[in-house]
Amino acid sequence: MPPLQTARGTPTSTATAAVVEALGPLHRATVIPMGTMGVGESQALAAQTERQGGQYLEAPVLGSQPQALTGTLLVMAGGDQEVFDQQRSLLNQLAEAPQRVGPVGSGAATKIALNQLIASLTHSFSLSLRLIQQAGVPVETFMDILRPSALYAPTFDKKLQRMLDGHYSDPNFSTSLLRKDLLLFLQEAADQGLQAQGLQGVADLLMQAKDTELDDQDYCALHALTGQS
C-alpha cells in the first residue's frame, strides 16, 4: 500500500506562531486563531500562548467572505469554557450561534473533518455528472431524481452551473486551499490510526492542479480534473 500524502506545519499555524512569539508577554490577552490547522499544531500554539502569559481559544470558521460580511459564519471554538464565555460577544459579531465544541484541538479537528467533506462531496458529484453525461442522461433529469433523495447536498446545486460551464474564476475557496486541507485531514487520520486510503485518490487528483491555473480558481475546478484520464 503506498504511503499517504500528508501535510505538516501548515502556513497558517507557522505564521500564527511567529506572530504570537513576536508579541512577547501577552499579559492575559487572548489569542484567537481562526484559520485551519492541525490538532497538534493548535495545541502547541496554545502552550506557546500560555508560556507567554496569554489565553487561547481556537475558533476556526466554516464559510467565506459573504458569510463574514453578514455575520453568519459557523464558528467551532476549542478551549476553556471560561475563555469562550469571555469572547462570546466578539464571536457573536461573526456568527449567529458560535459553538464551543470542546477543549483545544477539538475545534481544529471539527474544521478539518468538515473540509474533508468539501473534497469528498465535490469529487463524488463531479464523477456522477461525468458518468451520466457520457451515458446521454440529461443533467436536469438526473438532478430531478437526486434533489428529493437522501443523497442530495445543497452544494451540488451551488456548484452545478460552474461545473457545466467550466467557470471556476472568482473563488470563495481555492483548489490549492482544498488540497492543503485534505492533506491535513489525511495526516490527522493517520495520526489517529484511521483508514483514510480511499481519500488518497482525491488528494492525488488535486495535486494535478498544482502550478496550473486551476490552483487559484474555485475548488469546484476539481471537475476539470475528473474529466482527464
Task: Spell out what each predicted region is.
Residues M1-T30, M37-G40, M76:
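Rossmann-like NAD(P)-binding element
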Residues E82-N92, Y168-D170, H223-S229:
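Short, basic, helix/turn surface patches
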Residues A7-A18, E96-V101, Y152-T155:
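Short, composition-biased local secondary-structure segments
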Residues S106-T226:
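Helical "substrate-binding/catalytic lid" subdomain
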Residues P3-G9, A15, A77-V83, K159-D165, ...:
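Short, structured secondary-structure boundary patches
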Residues V20-G24, A46, E50, R88, ...:
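A structural alpha-helix within SAM-dependent methyltransferase catalytic domains
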Residues L26, R51, Q93-A95, Q134, ...:
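Short, well-ordered coil/turn elements that cap or connect secondary structure elements
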